[in-house]
From Swiss-Prot:
It comes from Aquifex aeolicus (strain VF5). This is GDP-mannose:di-myo-inositol-1,3'-phosphate beta-1,2-mannosyltransferase. Its cofactor is Mg(2+). GO terms for molecular function: glycosyltransferase activity. Belongs to the MDIP synthase family. Catalyzes the transfer of the mannosyl group from GDP-mannose to di-myo-inositol-1,3'-phosphate (DIP), producing mannosyl-di-myo-inositol phosphate (MDIP). Can also use MDIP as an acceptor of a second mannose residue, yielding di-mannosyl-di-myo-inositol phosphate (MMDIP). The keyword Cell membrane does not apply. Its EC number is 2.4.1.361. Keywords: Glycosyltransferase, Magnesium, Transferase. It catalyses: bis(myo-inositol) 1,3'-phosphate + GDP-alpha-D-mannose = 2-O-(beta-D-mannosyl)-bis(myo-inositol) 1,3'-phosphate + GDP + H(+); 2-O-(beta-D-mannosyl)-bis(myo-inositol) 1,3'-phosphate + GDP-alpha-D-mannose = 2-O-(beta-D-mannosyl-(1->2)-beta-D-mannosyl)-bis(myo-inositol) 1,3'-phosphate + GDP + H(+); bis(myo-inositol) 1,3'-phosphate + 2 GDP-alpha-D-mannose = 2-O-(beta-D-mannosyl-(1->2)-beta-D-mannosyl)-bis(myo-inositol) 1,3'-phosphate + 2 GDP + 2 H(+).
Length: 356
């Protein structure tokens, strides 16, 4: 079975990460895959979509995304059709060339090649398919996508809830503040203002815990922050570098501003398995995570609560241990292996149904 994946690929965004997690696990299991990705010129127009590694031999760059000025994208459909695939996974997101995706899915359907969509769009208005029932199944990460994003766009029996996957547990060996310094770390491309609660919170935290270091690695220009406890570097980190940085830190401060859209934080699912204590704002990105005694992260709602939680975690070893245990449990329950099992079973059930 050759699985086609229509998606961003090798890029710094949640769409690409999801496709890579599932795609590479299918590849590891012996399934050939073909990835149909956007042209590099098209992909690079969007600030959050930067390539992080060269393409593999199974990647075919064959479509233009919607342009920033609203111009409709397009697919070189012949490039797709000349590849032999038995099934197509569409990682659906708001910059897709929707008209051509529909056209492609219908052509494949007529050839007996079924397709499913995985919804990354966060708002009902973002989805611009004229008929989503062309897909055999429409997969979403949680119930919010059913109620707020899909609504009446697709028949209920076609919807499948499959959570966003986690990379496996890879615990580091660092003891908390083992060198006498409490080390904090952030990475990524988040807007500058989303770091403000952490900077302001650490200024207060330092009054009780003066030996603090906050390392920020961003893939764009450094923040205009001139605090002596802040160290900055401009660099795109690959996964192994991220893991190494987190294993050298005591806290991972994850900046995410709130939104009305339905969203998940792919960053969290990528790195929670390091078991470095992760701190997150209690907003839409993280609202489906367990809270209270089962929380796999440290939540905060404002700077005062952030400081309170950081002090508690720094002083209470049992609290830190509990958070890590919860994180490990969450990662195991949503491991990329388990989630790929779900997709593998779904794909096989659709193919068997189509044969009969």
């Amino acid at each position: 079975m050759n699985v086609g994946i229509f998606s961003r690929w090798n890029a710094t965004c949640g769409v690409s990460l999801h496709a890579e997690m599932i795609g590479r696990e299918l590849l590891r299991r012996g399934y050939p895959i073909t990835v149909f990705a956007p042209y590099l010129e098209s992909a690079s127009r969007w600030w959050h979509h930067k390539l992080i590694r060269p393409d593999e031999e199974y990647v075919v760059r064959c479509y233009e995304e919607l342009s920033p000025d609203g111009k409709e994208g397009k697919i070189d459909i012949e490039k797709v059709l000349e590849r032999e695939i038995d099934f197509l996974i569409v990682e659906s997101y708001e910059k897709l060339p929707y008209k051509d995706v529909e056209k492609l899915v219908k052509i494949l359907k007529d050839k007996g090649i079924p397709s499913i969509a995985i919804i990354h769009e966060g708002d009902y208005e973002d989805i611009r398919y004229t008929d989503m029932n062309i897909f055999e199944k429409v997969c979403v990460f949680d119930e919010r996508y059913v109620k707020e994003v899909l609504k009446d766009r697709v028949s209920e029996e076609k919807v499948e809830i499959i959570p966003y996957p986690c990379y496996p547990v890879r615990e580091g060996s660092r003891e908390f503040a083992e060198d006498g310094v409490i080390k904090f770390f952030s990475f990524g491309r988040q807007p500058k203002e989303e770091y403000c609660p952490y900077i302001e919170g650490l200024k207060v935290f330092k009054r009780d815990f003066p030996n603090v270091k906050y390392r920020i690695v961003r893939a764009m220009e450094p923040l205009k922050i001139f605090e002596d406890f802040v160290e900055q570097e401009e660099r795109i980190l690959d996964y192994e570098e991220i893991v190494k940085e987190l294993h050298s830190a005591d806290f991972h401060l994850l900046p995410k501003g709130n939104t009305k859209r339905v969203v998940v934080s792919s960053t969290l699912y990528q790195v929670l398995g390091t078991l470095t204590l992760t701190v997150v704002p209690d907003n839409r990105f993280f609202e489906t995570l367990p809270h209270g005694e089962e929380a796999p992260v440290i939540f905060y709602r404002d700077v005062l609560e952030l400081v309170k939680e950081l002090k508690k975690a720094s002083a209470d070893e049992e609290y830190r241990k509990k958070i890590r245990e919860n994180a490990s449990k969450f990662v195991e329950e949503n491991s990329v292996e388990r989630i790929t099992d779900r997709f593998e079973n779904l794909i096989n059930s659709i193919l068997v149904k189509n044969v009969h």
